[in-house]
Amino acid sequence: MKRYNGKLILFGEYSMIFGSEALLTPYYSVFGEWSSVINRPSETALESNANIRNFYEYLCNDDTFKILDLRRLGMELDAGLSFDSNIPLGYGVGSSGALVAAIFDRYKLIEINETSKLKDFLAKMECYFHGSSSGMDPLQCYWGKPFILSQRTTDNGQQLSILDDDFMSEDIHIFLIDTKIKSPTAPLVEHFKELREDTSYLDKFDNEYVPLVSKCIKSMTDKKDDEFFNYLLQLSKLQLELLTHTIPEETRDFFLTDIKEDGFQVKLCGAGGGGFLLGFTKDMEKTNNYWQDTEYHIHWVK
């Protein structure tokens, strides 16, 4: 049975909604796969079947989704279809993206070969869960490989470049910090869009934040570690300033940690508001020692 892994937005959360570069990678530790209430009867499977049915009704009410075999989906739901997933909800690691990718993959009647059109179609599907979507999460879950989405241009739109699994330095390790707070994405994204209506905020975001996203991506994939951690610290501080509403108050000091003094650095993971925070380090032992004396649990990604 095919698995649809979770995803991590390493760089580009929020900014990619408006066409910035983004770097995404699979989160292999969590995944979803098709199952059946009949084969695995449980309250969770019944709830999954009911949730997919609600999504199915949304898809049926929009002609955009005619390229999906919705008749078959409806019949299989009647027969007990469910999606067995251990991807945590409200944690920014692709719970809805994996389901969208799985439905598209299983029920598509035609292929969508152009990346931008595929992304837009998946975004329209995922809007059901978040109110708005860039389409990047389900695209990542669908491809199942790390990739960079280029900055949008007038001429070429956005191009997708698949990366090798060793796209970053072997000395950099990634971990997730569990804030123990579940958070819905839609209100956070809507508030961000409202903030962008202020011209001074928009200017700082587009002219300082977005270029830093690109610098983080380039320095990481060029394996220039010192440059990377320097740009990452600048980005984290700007997230603290420009995306304060997405960072739980009790975790804000983490965004000021410096690799040189603390041994690790922290940024948002997905929409924020809780869920996981994303950490980067070159010293796993020192990082483990730091977090074992706190109330937070960490999960190693790489």
Describe each PLM feature range.
Residues 3-9, 15-17, 24-26, 33-61, ...:
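C-terminal nucleotide
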Residues 26-27, 100:
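Generic structural signal for well-ordered secondary structure
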Residues 86-98:
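Gly/Ser-rich catalytic serine loop of serine hydrolases
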Residues 94-96, 269-274:
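Glycine-rich beta-strand-to-loop/alpha-helix junction loops that act as flexible
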Residues 98-110:
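Stable alpha-helical structural segments in soluble proteins, enriched in small hydrophobic residues
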